[in-house]
Curated annotation (Swiss-Prot):
Keyword match Chaperone: no
Organism this protein belongs to: Vigna radiata var. radiata
InterPro entries xref list: Bowman-Birk_prot_inh (IPR035995), Prot_inh_BBI (IPR000877)
Extra facts: Functionally this inhibitor is unusual in that it stoichiometrically inhibits trypsin in a molar ratio of 1:2. The specificities and functions of this superfamily of inhibitors depend not only on the active sites within the domains, but also upon the amino acid composition, and resulting molecular conformation, surrounding these regions.
Protein name: Bowman-Birk type trypsin inhibitor
A GO molecular-function descriptor: serine-type endopeptidase inhibitor activity
Residues spanning the signal sequence: none
Family: Belongs to the Bowman-Birk serine protease inhibitor family.
Pfam families in alphabetical order: Bowman-Birk_leg
Residue ranges the record marks as coiled coil: none
Consequence of changing residue 3 to K: In 3rd isoinhibitor
Length: 72
């Protein structure tokens, strides 16, 4: 097994919602195939093939958008 995180597992989020509270409570609605990003503590996946997974973590920030990861 290799512990190197793949590029695709870097934490990122394209659809992040935050409450207006202080501190904000943010969660990501992104669906990823087969796994959640590497920083996700609470990940749920459907039983389909491939599994559609989303991270249920609540943070006080949003991760950077995933689309921007391909280009500098």
């Amino acid at each position: 097994s290799h512990d190197e995180p793949s590029e695709s597992s870097e934490p990122c989020c394209d659809s992040c919602d935050c409450t207006k509270s202080i501190p904000p409570e943010c969660h990501c609605a992104n669906i990823r195939l087969n796994s959640c990003h590497s920083a996700c503590k609470s990940c749920i996946c459907t039983r389909s093939m491939p599994g559609k997974c989303r991270c249920l973590d609540t943070d006080d920030f949003c991760y950077k958008p995933c689309e921007s990861m391909d280009k500098d």
